[in-house]
Structures are given as C-alpha cells and as structure tokens.
Design a protein with these regions (language model features):
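Outer-membrane beta-barrel transmembrane domain signature
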Residues: 21-86, 145-211, 217-220, 231-233
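Short, electropositive alpha-helical surface patch
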Residues: 224-230
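Sec-dependent N-terminal signal peptides
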Residues: 4-14
Length: 233
C-alpha cells in the first residue's frame, strides 16, 4: 500500500515539481529581515496547507482506510515578496479512516517534498442533513518546517456535498490560522495570522475503490487548485 501511494504521488506531482523551486532555498534566497513581508508569506503557506482539508470528502469505516495522494498549487499573494514562483506546488499523502459507531473520521497527512516537511492530521465528522445533502466538518493541525523556518498550521472546515451517479460536487468554507518563526537568523523573526477560505470541487468515483478529485480554492488575498486520487481499502 505504501508503494502504491508513493507511485500515485510521483505520478501526480512530477510534472509540476520539475517546474517548482525548492521552498526552503527560495525562502533563504529572498527573505530579508525587516524588509520581507513574513505575515503575507505565512498567510499563503496556511492557504497552501489548508487546501488539503477535504481531499475526497469520504472515509471508510475502520479497518477500512482511504489513502489519497494530493497536489496543492497556490498562487502567492501580491503582498508576499518572498516566494519567487508564480505558483507554489506541494503534494501530500493522506490516510483517513472512520471510527465505528461514532462516525468520527481520523486523518493523518504529511509531506517531505520540495524542501518542505510537514506532519499533521485531524478529525472529521459527516452527517446527512436531508436525503440528498451531506455535511462534513473537520479540524486539523499541521507542523511544518524547512531549513530556514518552522510553522504551525491550524484549520477548521465545513463542506456540503451531494452525489449524482458517480459525481459528487461540493462547496466548502474554512479558516486557516498559522504561526511561523525563522531559524538560523540572528535574531529570528516570527509572525502569526489567519485568513478565511472558500472552495468548490468535484469528486469522481468511477470504480468502487477509486476516487478522483479536483477543487478550486480562494482566500482573501489569493487562490489555488488542488487535485489527486484516493483509493479505498
């Protein structure tokens, strides 16, 4: 299963990562204390990670598991004078299962690509409001780092979806809050802030074990795209 997840990640991310700069090196090359807008960089980083909150909108009941390979692509905001790429690219591996009887989903996610390492997770809850409308809620925490900074990311999200044949369109809202602190500088600098996030997406379930998904995300200052594949075991 791990090998399959790795193959999915490589397949989804290789073309994009080939065009992307190393996030750690890019920060080192463009960050200047007192001049660079660390708050704007932190806000964009929160949005980049927060887009992963709902990668498929569904989970299998334990011992079943949903394993996803996700790619986030986020455009740096106009105030971010640190990131040099037109878009920042970051893939994630995500594992999710649901606790029997409680209906609570448990999510683990992480990445170690493009100079950025992150490990996190959270809890989700799904309910049917009316016969054709499903609601999902989630709360997450992620701890990330490069060689030049560390960051903590907190998020909460809510999503509404409906299933028509093999298609599940959905719309969601969320809020990302994060703290960042540079490392290796004298003195180091820190920043913290948050921003709301809106999302619209589509899941496609062509086979019982396979789900594909794409979504568009907009924040107060920027926007991004996310997509990938999920496998149910």
């Amino acid at each position: 299963m791990k090998k399959l997840a790795l193959l999915l990640t490589v397949f989804l991310t290789a073309p994009l990562l080939a065009l992307a700069d190393n996030m750690g090196n890019d920060f080192r090359d463009h960050y200047v204390r007192g001049t660079s807008n660390l708050k704007a960089y932190n806000r964009d980083l929160n949005g980049l990670v927060g887009m992963v909150d709902f990668h498929t909108g569904r989970a299998k009941v334990f011992p079943g598991i949903n394993l996803g390979a996700n790619v986030s692509v986020f455009k740096p905001s106009s105030g971010n004078n640190i990131s040099s790429d037109s878009y920042t690219v970051l893939p994630f591996l995500i594992a999710e299962t649901k606790i029997p009887y409680l209906g609570v989903g448990v999510v683990a996610r992480g990445t170690d690509v493009n100079g950025y390492r992150s490990l996190g997770g959270g809890l989700t809850y799904q309910m049917t409001l009316i016969e054709f409308l499903n609601l999902s809620f989630g709360a997450f925490y992620d701890n990330g780092r490069t060689d030049w900074y560390r960051n903590d990311h907190y998020s909460a999200s809510a999503i509404a979806s409906t299933t028509i044949l093999m298609f599940t369109p959905y719309i969601g809202v969320g809020y990302d809050y994060g703290k960042i602190k540079t490392r290796g500088y004298d003195p180091n600098e820190s920043a913290s802030n948050g921003t709301p996030r809106g999302m619209v997406g589509l899941n496609v379930n062509p086979f019982p074990l396979l789900t594909g998904f794409v979504a568009y995300t907009v924040t107060k200052d920027s926007h991004g795209f996310t997509g990938g594949l999920g496998l149910n075991f």
